[in-house]
Amino acid sequence: QPPHFRPHGISLYIDTNGKRHLGIINHPKNRELEPENVELFSEDENGLFMHQQTITDPLFKSPNALVLMAQNKFYLGNDKGAETAFGKIQEQLGRPMSKIIYFNGDSASVAAENLSQISGINTSKNNKYLFASETAAKRIAIFSINENNGVLKKLETIKINGSPDNINVSSNDDLIVAAIPKVMALIQHFISFQKEEIMPAPSQVFQIKWDFNSEATIEELFLSNGEDISTTSVGAIFDSKLFMGSITDKKLLICDL
């Protein structure tokens, strides 16, 4: 196992033999001073995931999300991209500077850039399209994937009424997107932890039906003030139920659809 493990983004890949593999972002103790890593695990005969490889690259600046394309190939989304003090100010003011990185099994390269705070990425079931949450711009970016070199070509963006986080893709390629309805409420929620007077923050989940040949349809599946679950960061549909996870709450909320 890695000597230090501070996991963030996680992705599951199932190969043609049915064997499962995990890719997990592993933040260092001192972010911006030490390298960011991606840890690769594979399932053994007992169903346990054993560590296989640690991958690091200077392009892994501020990784937030990743999606495995094969056992050791993946896309990684940096939620920040600025490298200078002035650049960080520009980014805070809204300049899109995030990048999506492609690791081809040997080396990393920039697959897409000039994006607004990537917080979630996923692919269509046929691996021809990649979806990315541009949190600061309140939109989902849709890319076609070049199978030869991993480069992403932006096809369109879908605006939503919230700041998107992680994206799950259903069996019929619908996007299940967790979102932050009010960013200021999220900030107040984080501050309340320091004061030990927990203030709930609203939660939101969208279902987006997207087809290359038609306009996307957006349905709000869930919206609450945060009393039941605060700051939803992920949503998934299984067996006609919506499962939701949170940035801060140590629980899942399950709702009938």
Short names for language-model regions:
Residues 24-32, 76-95, 178-200:
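Short, conserved, GDST-rich strand-edge loop motifs in beta-rich repeat architectures
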Residues 31-39, 86, 97, 139-142, ...:
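Structural motif
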Residues 1-14, 57-74, 80-82, 95-100, ...:
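Beta-rich, blade/repeat-based domains predominating
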Residues 35-45, 92-105, 197-211:
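Beta-propeller blade signature
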Residues 1, 44-58, 99-120, 141-160, ...:
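Blade-edge beta-strand/turn elements of extracellular beta-propeller
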Residues 21-23, 73-75, 129-132, 174-177, ...:
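Conserved beta-propeller blade signature
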